[in-house]
């Protein structure tokens, strides 16, 4: 039957692709605009089970993945969207065993994804100067099940010989020298910036500090409405969210 839902487990109630609800399997009622779902009825049943609300509307109980936690986590800052997160993971080569420095934890969206991919032997060292966001990020990481792979810090970059440094800051160009010092030779650098002015300053700093293979990309995501005989692009799309700059560390002789 697969993985059974235990009391206290997270469940993603799927109504349709625009309406999903991250809940815990507890002995209580969950109220929606489509009726009441008795969450206790999920306990002991398998993920993927279909349940009906008091109004007779069907929900599917799915096991949340890292994308669901990113979208549903408590926020206090703008998060990096999954379309951009995917590019960052591929371009930086982060995987099991990687040691990664992140600057700009925010509420932990990128941190959660990094921690998910460095498991089980890797480590994420995440820096955030605002204590209130560290607390929120810690709770979000705990719920996503990846807290043990992350060290949350609030000052300085102390690490060295890391595989990747990833920045989500207002002034990333100021951190470029520290990123260079922290990286191993050939290590990966990535920086997410919403404006082109930030990006220009960051690229200039990268060139001045021995980085190579510098490139900046923007990812636009358009959904497709698939219906037999009338397939078409969605009216709305996820357009500009930011510019992502990548680079590699070249050793200075």
What do the PLM-derived regions correspond to, one by one?
Residues 1-63:
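N-terminal auxiliary segments of SAM/dcSAM-dependent transferases
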Residues 115-116, 173-187, 207:
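A short glycine-rich, Lys/Arg-flanked "PGG" loop and its adjoining helix->strand segment in the class I
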Residues 186-194, 198:
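Conserved beta-strand signature within the Rossmann-like core of class I S-adenosyl-L-methionine
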Residues 95-106, 165:
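Conserved class I S-adenosyl-L-methionine
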Residues 95, 118-119, 146, 183-187:
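Helix-to-beta-strand junctions that scaffold the AdoMet/dcAdoMet cofactor pocket
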Residues 127-172:
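S-adenosyl-L-methionine
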Residues 207-212, 220-253:
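Core SAM-dependent methyltransferase catalytic element
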